[in-house]
Structure formats: C-alpha cells, structure tokens
Curated annotation (Swiss-Prot):
Protein name: Very-long-chain 3-oxoacyl-CoA reductase
Underlying gene: Hsd17b12
EC identifiers of the protein: 1.1.1.330, 1.1.1.62
Pfam families (alphabetical): adh_short
Tissue expression as described in the entry: Expressed in most tissues tested.
Family listed: Belongs to the short-chain dehydrogenases/reductases (SDR) family. 17-beta-HSD 3 subfamily.
Organism the protein comes from: Mus musculus (Mouse)
Catalytic reactions of this protein: a very-long-chain (3R)-3-hydroxyacyl-CoA + NADP(+) = a very-long-chain 3-oxoacyl-CoA + NADPH + H(+); 17beta-estradiol + NAD(+) = estrone + NADH + H(+); 17beta-estradiol + NADP(+) = estrone + NADPH + H(+); 3-oxooctadecanoyl-CoA + NADPH + H(+) = (3R)-hydroxyoctadecanoyl-CoA + NADP(+)
Length: 312
C-alpha cells in the first residue's frame, strides 16, 4: 500500500483551508449585504437620541432629504444654510408637513467667522443627530492650475467641505458625549474612496471627511456615539447637475431612505445598494485601469462643458 508523500498532504490541507476560508468570507459578505440592504436598521435614528437634529446645507438635495426624513421620524429640525429665503421656505414646509418645530441659522460656510453665530443658535438644544452635509464642488472638471479663480476656490472648498465638518462637530459633540448617545452623519462622496483627477481638491476634501469620520467613530464609540461616513456615487441633485433620477442615480429622497437604514450597521456606507455594487467593482479594478477610465470620463465632461460654454 502506497502512502502519499507528506508534501501532498500538506498541500491538500492548505487548499482545503483556503477554500473553507473563502466560502466563509463569501457567506459572511452575503449575510451582511442582506442585513444592510434588505433588513436595515430602521428604528435607530429618532427622537430617543435627542429632541433635535441639525442639518447643514439643508435647503437642497441630500441635506433637505435628510431633514425631511428626520422630521418624519418626529425630530425637531435645525437647518443651517446660506440663504435665509430658502431656509424659511424649507423650514415652513417641514413644519407644515410633519408638524415639528424648526429653527434656521443663515450663514455662509465659505467664511470662517460664522461659528459663534452657529454656537449661539444651537445653545441649549438636546441634539441627537448631526448631518454634516454642506458641500461644494467644481463648476466642471478641470486641471488643477487651470481652475478659474484658483486661490479663492481652494479656500472655499476647504472652508465648506472640511472646516465646516470639524467646527460644527466641535459644537455638537460635547452634548452628545455628556448624554452618552448621538449620531453624526458626515456626507463624504465616492470621490473620496478613490482619487478623481480633474476634481483634485474636491476629491481630497471628501477623503478627509471619510478619514475624519472613521477616526472620530473609533474615538467616541465607547461613549455611545455612532459616526458614519456616507459616500454616495451620483445622486440626482442640483450640486451634481442631474435633474432626472435613474436606477444608478437615485433622487435625494430615495437615497436618504436607503442610507438612513444603514446607521448602526456600517460606519462607511455608499448608502444605496447599486452604489455599493459600483464601489465593489471599483475596489477590485486594477488601479491603472481605474485611472484610465476615470480620467477619460473627467476629460469628456470637461470638453463637453467647455464646448457648451464656447457656443454660449
């Protein structure tokens, strides 16, 4: 009777162990996907975290959709944005539709001397949810040195996309820690997952928001605070210049209804199942291939914009 050589037995167990490991990983991934996208965590976000929700950039798009969803769940809403007229309009609509108290704070997040006013406006409120949504992008994809009014654009992008997240969190977080509960939703972007050339500064600011969120969650999860980085692909909003929703470019309302169910389940989320699939594809794509595709896409958008501007 012949015996298999020791090496053959070793390789068998290496192969069997590898297959078992991959099968377990695949099973766990499927379970998590079912838990997040089919079951969700509907009940976590609501007034039990605190009476008030604060939403920056809450008069349009994703911010407005979050404000409405939180009001629908019975939370009082503080809207912070630039235009008092828009704030009044959205605030009154929320008040009438959902029968909740609302407040507004009109500030321009491109400036850096606004935070005392915000602090005064939030004073004494039991804030359970903060949505750091305010943001800006480029008018169109462009090479770094050719960005119109470059120095001012750099300052505005950093003030609006980065400084606002840090400073408003600084104002709200102490109260959450004191009460040992709270949720902070920082709206990053899929542009923060992987670099997006021709949107260089925007992409970098959104990567900051993602890293800030991950670190903050690790620092304060033991205090009862859940911090989530929300990283959507394209959503049909004014900022994205998309008017008509599609399957892969949902309306802000559809996106938020999906994303809010991931709170407590994912600290980093694309917020929407189709976007999750897109993220998975991008993550396994060779980097050279990704850059070739995304650079071609950015150049195409740039050329289309410049041709249209030239005609006008």
């Amino acid at each position: 009777m012949e015996c298999a050589p020791p090496a053959a037995g070793f390789l068998y167990w290496v192969g069997a162990s590898t297959i078992a490991y991959l099968a377990l990983r695949a099973s766990y991934s499927l379970f998590r996907a079912f838990q997040v996208w089919c079951v969700g965590n509907e009940a976590l976000v609501g007034p039990r975290l605190g009476e008030w929700a604060v939403v920056t950039g809450g008069t349009d798009g994703i911010g407005k959709a979050y404000a409405e969803e939180l009001a629908k769940r019975g939370m009082k809403i503080v809207l912070i944005s630039r235009s008092q007229d828009k704030l009044n309009q959205v605030s009154n609509n929320i008040k009438e539709k959902f029968n909740v108290e609302t407040r507004t704070i009109a500030v321009d997040f491109s400036l850096d001397d606004i935070y005392d006013k915000i602090k005064t406006g939030l004073s004494g409120l039991e804030i359970g949810v903060l949505v750091n949504n305010v943001g800006m992008s480029y008018e169109y994809p462009e090479y770094f040195l050719e960005i119109p009014d470059l120095d001012n654009t750099i300052k505005k992008l950093i003030n609006i996309n980065v400084l606002s997240v840090c400073k408003v969190t600084r104002l709200v977080l102490p109260g959450m820690v004191e009460r040992s509960k709270g949720v902070i939703l920082n709206i990053s972007s899929a542009s923060g997952m992987l670099p997006v050339p021709l949107l260089t500064i925007y992409s970098a600011t959104k990567a900051f928001v993602d890293f800030f969120s991950q670190c903050l969650h690790e620092e304060y999860k033991s205090k009862g605070i859940f911090v989530q980085s929300v990283m959507p692909y394209l959503v049909a909003t004014k900022l994205a210049k998309i008017q008509k929703p599609t399957l892969d470019k949902p309306s802000a309302e559809t996106f938020v209804k999906s994303a809010i169910k991931t709170v407590g389940l994912q600290t980093r989320t694309t917020g929407y199942v189709i976007h999750s699939l897109m993220g998975s594809i991008n993550s396994i794509m060779p980097r050279w291939m990704y850059f070739k595709i995304i650079m071609g896409f950015s150049k195409s958008l740039r050329n289309r914009y410049l041709k249209k501007r030239k005609k006008n």
